[in-house]
Amino acid sequence: FKCFPFVIVAINILIAVASDFESAIRAWGTTWVSTEGVTLYGGWHNVFNGVAGLINIACMTGWFGIYVSKKKQDMLWPDMTWVFIVAYDIWNFCYTYNCLPTHSWYCGLALLLAPTVANFFWNKGGWIQNRANTLAIWCMFAQVFPMFQDESKFAVQSVNNPVSYTHL
């Protein structure tokens, strides 16, 4: 049980890393349309973010310190450092913007911010479970109401402007 949460998070990150590398390979310096019908711009930013994802996996600490709370309601990972959590949030937002641009506001910012704020202020050590919960809720919502993020007035489109990717 001790390594199960680590393995799940690592697999989740590896899937995102593969997506970043796929965008880089398919469309270096140009755009391509994903299987979901979303236009993506590929390039160095995808490679950079993919490597950052691999570094995230290498920097996960304290996974043998994971335990279940006394009331058996929460999985706690108290050794998960705030530095890792913030780095993961930044990396994951970059991933959603690069590879899931229609999800970047809701899935990226809102769902990353909720477990991070909870972890910092009132649910110490509960970040991983809160992150899993917010991700699961979003995935279920997105599957039931796919047009919310794709075509409604709440849809958020990426600029897909090559200039924004090549000039810092």
Task: Tell me the role of every PLM-derived stretch.
Residues 166-167:
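Conserved small/polar residues in nucleotide/adenosyl-binding loops
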Residues 92-94, 143-159:
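Hydrophobic alpha-helical transmembrane segments in multi-pass integral membrane proteins
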